[in-house]
């Protein structure tokens, strides 16, 4: 697979799940905390799963906007994507994540909305990165 990279960014983490992460350009700096469910203190910071969920949700809206014109559709201004990301042990060993995307497209006919969601899932960079590795559920709110 070849990718014609148009944009590149980097982030650095220190301290692992109880540390901090920031982008090289300084636009994002987050304190990280391990959730109680994973044996941590559940502090005030964020965790990688939350950051992944936020990124996937935002990216998926962008993917819908990218494919909508070819479908002769417009993504409503009040469209939302809620990404729910889970983490846990895999039966094969190690840990894995799951993702469920709940998409709200007010004003679109159900068949149009479902077609748009499927088309976006084929081009979304997060969907392409997870395909074959992460169980991703798609639903229309």
Predicted feature locations:
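Extended beta-strand/beta-hairpin segments
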Residues: 1-54, 61-141
